[in-house]
């Protein structure tokens, strides 16, 4: 998987071969499925993308898989991508990644009703920092309601954290083959970190989150 990751841009043929080898051996591995999905999508092989992503999503739902699935076919409209992701989400109705993927894609499609519908069941009992940030995006992009945006961003400070790639107390935006601390293989796991990853003040965090929302992105 690490080799496929390293040559994804420079040698896509080799990357596909390596990613598919890893995917075949372990259908629950996110990174090889995401790599293969992106590369097959770039070649217009939509059916292959769908099959690979669906196999892994059912075993290990993950945002990177949802993104690869959404962009499985070049030239699709935001509405097309939303419908595709909704179909994927239906296969894992009990995973929080399913409604989050739908809400994220709905926001990109400016379908505020669908975005709110996806997130509403999470607001009581399953609230997380990502959910709060998505709600802030909805309030900002749909209504330009700065007050509501800041309310939701303020709630991220005390909301439960979301899973991230983490190994030995280190958080990474992407999966890595080895721990930067111990060098151990396969150390990075997709899970909620035990300790805070930053010592920034609450005010600094709110400023950063507000900037991210204004850019239409989400924190990792």
Feature locations, PLM:
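TPR/TPR-like (Sel1-like) alpha-helical repeat modules
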Residues: 43-64, 123-129, 139-164
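Intrinsically disordered, low-complexity, charge-biased linker/tail regions
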Residues: 1-24, 63-71, 79-101, 150-220
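Acidic, glycine-rich loop-and-beta core segments that form the ion-binding/anion-interacting portion
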Residues: 1-55
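Structural motif corresponding to the intra-repeat A-B loop/turn of tetratricopeptide repeats
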Residues: 9-10, 42-43, 59, 72-76, ...
């Amino acid at each position: 998987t690490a080799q496929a990751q390293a040559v994804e841009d420079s040698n896509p043929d080799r990357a596909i071969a390596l990613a598919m080898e890893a995917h075949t051996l372990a259908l629950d591995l996110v990174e090889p499925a995401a790599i293969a999905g992106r590369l097959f999508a770039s070649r217009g092989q939509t059916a292959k993308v769908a099959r690979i992503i669906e196999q892994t999503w059912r075993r290990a739902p993950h945002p990177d898989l949802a993104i690869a699935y959404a962009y499985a076919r070049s030239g699709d409209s935001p509405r097309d991508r939303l419908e595709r992701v909704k179909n994927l989400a239906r296969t894992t109705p009990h995973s929080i990644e399913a409604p989050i993927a739908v809400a994220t894609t709905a926001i990109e499609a400016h379908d505020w009703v669908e975005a709110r519908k996806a997130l509403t069941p999470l607001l009581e009992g399953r609230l997380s920092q990502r959910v709060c940030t998505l709600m802030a995006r909805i309030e900002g992009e749909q209504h330009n309601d700065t007050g509501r945006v800041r309310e939701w961003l303020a709630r991220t400070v005390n909301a439960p954290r979301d899973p991230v790639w983490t190994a030995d107390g280190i958080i990474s935006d992407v999966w890595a083959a080895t721990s930067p601390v111990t060098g151990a293989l396969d150390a990075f796991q997709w899970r909620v970190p035990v300790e805070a990853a930053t010592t920034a003040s609450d005010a600094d965090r709110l400023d950063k989150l507000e900037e991210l929302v204004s850019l239409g992105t989400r924190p990792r």
